Amino acid sequence: MTTTVETAAATGRVARVIGPVVDVEFPVDAMPEIYNALHVEVADPAEDGARKTLTLEVAQHLGDGVVRAISMQPTDGLVRQAPVTDTGTGITVPVGDVTKGKVFNTLGQILNEPEAEAQITERWPIHRKAPAFDQLESKTEMFETGLKVVDLLTPYVKGGKIGLFGGAGVGKTVLIQEMIMRVAKLHDGVSVFAGVGERTREGNDLIDEMTESGVLEKTALVFGQMDEPPGTRLRVALSALTMAEYFRDVQKQDVLLFIDNIFRFTQAGSEVSTLLGRMPSAVGYQPTLADEMGVLQERITSTRGHSITSMQAIYVPADDLTDPAPATTFAHLDATTVLSRPISEKGIYPAVDPLDSTSRILDPRYISQDHYAAASRVKGILQKYKDLQDIIAILGIDELGEEDKLVVHRARRVERFLSQNTHAAKQFTGLDGSDVPLDESIAAFNAICDGDYDHFPEQAFFMCGGLDDLKAKAKELGVS
């Protein structure tokens, strides 16, 4: 699919500039369509007046030939009456193998090497329709990650949408980095990463780590960081998704799409909505919140035989899961992995809350009976332990009955055994990551719940892989 437009480009003039919002006047019979990209040349004050091309995206038709556009770059140096060219098409990004190993901005410009060196042969527009209903794949298949807590308690769906919920600093980005490494190593798949409104330092660290671990060559990265205008942050997820769609639809590959952070996408939408003068709705969010989220999420799907599996980090403002931004995202997800601050404070990583996290396929219709039984058993023990917490806090553990003491004894071991060393956290811990097959996880948790390892000290269960790791740690602590 090509995006060339044969018509002569219409030219207008800048009528008004207010921050990233630019009003442009065109001839009434040559107004650009909504979502068209406009180009305007400016003298950049930061570069001693060097000329650069700004890209604007049409957001509203105000009438009488005037359109309101949102700038994708800072508008410093833009003046009234500056000539503006309508490109006749929306923003486009490069697609195909040329994107692997490269870092792009929202406009598809390469950031980590000279653009002239890249052999870009095809570009797709970022605004595209979702696949037709009859093209969708209805088969449900589990996506194994090698992380015990995820595979056992919140199994991911191949071609599904996975949400990583958590407040600041509980490990969302580390878990996403871990999944990128695991996908490249375990599944030999293509990954596309969208950095939406996150810290530039984190993006830089991610690129360095991916280069070191050798997975950068299988990944395309698209960044629209915190310091960029809201228009860029609102569109960066669509740019990355377009690259992923090409791998799925043309190259017939299974793709993993990582979005960090989907909350910043909502936040950018809220800023743009306010700039366009729309009336805010609940908690100050844009009135089109559900619609904008739906447009993005409906394109992330599986078509016949090929899938886009997406993992989305979702910042939870003030740890409040009822906030409209995370609440709107919930409706689209197949699995939710809730990262908990109290669990991260215990030093248990990944800090997944086993009772709050859910999965659509944690059901005997989709997974084995053994898997379902083990997951239910583990959740049951942890739930009972949680129910006893108040009594323990007030009266102490000695006031519990023998049966309850045994539940607490085993639950503490189960809780610690849910922790695991990850490849991405090696820089913090100095320990190699571990991969635990699902069958081994099921057998290990059944054995712990049966009391086979009641005589092992609690610290032996902490940050280990499978049963062999557990036994080796116990031996180090002097227990056979």
Curated annotation (Swiss-Prot):
It is found in: Cell membrane. Its main location: membrane. It is a peripheral membrane protein. InterPro entries: AAA+_ATPase, ATP-synt_VA_C, ATP_synth_F1_bsu, ATPase_a/bsu_AS, ATPase_alpha/beta_chains, ATPase_F1/V1/A1_a/bsu_N, ATPase_F1/V1/A1_a/bsu_N_sf, ATPase_F1/V1/A1_a/bsu_nucl-bd. One of its GO terms (molecular function) is ATP hydrolysis activity. It catalyses: ATP + H2O + 4 H(+)(in) = ADP + phosphate + 5 H(+)(out). ATP binds at residues 166-173. Keywords: ATP synthesis, ATP-binding, Cell membrane, CF(1), Hydrogen ion transport, Ion transport, Membrane, Nucleotide-binding, Translocase, Transport. The keyword Chloroplast does not apply. Its EC number is 7.1.2.2. The keyword NAD does not apply. F-type ATPases have 2 components, CF(1) - the catalytic core - and CF(0) - the membrane proton channel. CF(1) has five subunits: alpha(3), beta(3), gamma(1), delta(1), epsilon(1). CF(0) has three main subunits: a(1), b(2) and c(9-12). The alpha and beta chains form an alternating ring which encloses part of the gamma chain. CF(1) is attached to CF(0) by a central stalk formed by the gamma and epsilon chains, while a peripheral stalk is formed by the delta and b chains. Belongs to the ATPase alpha/beta chains family. This is ATP synthase subunit beta. It comes from Streptomyces griseus subsp. griseus (strain JCM 4626 / CBS 651.72 / NBRC 13350 / KCC S-0626 / ISP 5235). The lineage of its organism: Bacteria, Bacillati, Actinomycetota, Actinomycetes, Kitasatosporales.
